[in-house]
Amino acid sequence: MATLGTGMRCLKSCVFILNIICLLCSLVLIGAGAYVEVKFSQYEANLHKVWQAAPIAIIVVGVVILIVSFLGCCGAIKENVCMLYMYAFFLIVLLIAELVAAIVAVVYKDKIDDEINTLMTGALENPNEEITATMDKIQTSFHCCGVKGPDDYKGNVPASCKEGQEVYVQGCLSVFSAFLKRNLIIVACVAFGVCFFQLLSIVIACCLGQRIHDYQNV
């Protein structure tokens, strides 16, 4: 078998370096998912199931990227064509999954205001212990009151709407929706960075795999 030339050694180094970057990005993605999960878990009674599942899905994707990146590193170090192609295949599957997730996120981003409005209004009209506790957390955390303002309570303002004797005047719909959108943007930025490095890794891994295959058959 011929020895890999300078160009192939360069490709091998690129695959290894890109996978180290993907490993680090996956850790950031896992951290971002955990952060969002902690934040969202406080208000899960007022969230659609898609939003409740999103942080867990982000963490799972991060773990999968971590494992796949490790496979890519091993394939590059061992100059194993099969491992490199398996690595590229898994990355392609991940990219497709991430694209689907991005489409779902965009669709639900446009529906956040309507969804939160419906859920919060329903919570005020048909309260129960869990929903009331969630609304209290939202009102205390975001210094807001009701859906659009304290008038939603028709004079029976709860203690969570007050700081001392002062009643919060801002409604919770706008601030809570902004909170969800902010966290969505954070995760989207991290995911976009990961996708960029994944795409580069796929191209370079396929090139390296093909060249190694050619060298092994010289």
UniProtKB/Swiss-Prot annotation:
It is a multi-pass membrane protein. Residues 37-55, 109-183 are extracellular. GO terms for cellular component: plasma membrane. It is found in: Membrane. Pfam families: Tetraspanin (PF00335). Keywords: Membrane, Transmembrane, Transmembrane helix. PANTHER family: TETRASPANIN (PTHR19282:SF544). This is 23 kDa integral membrane protein. It comes from Schistosoma japonicum.
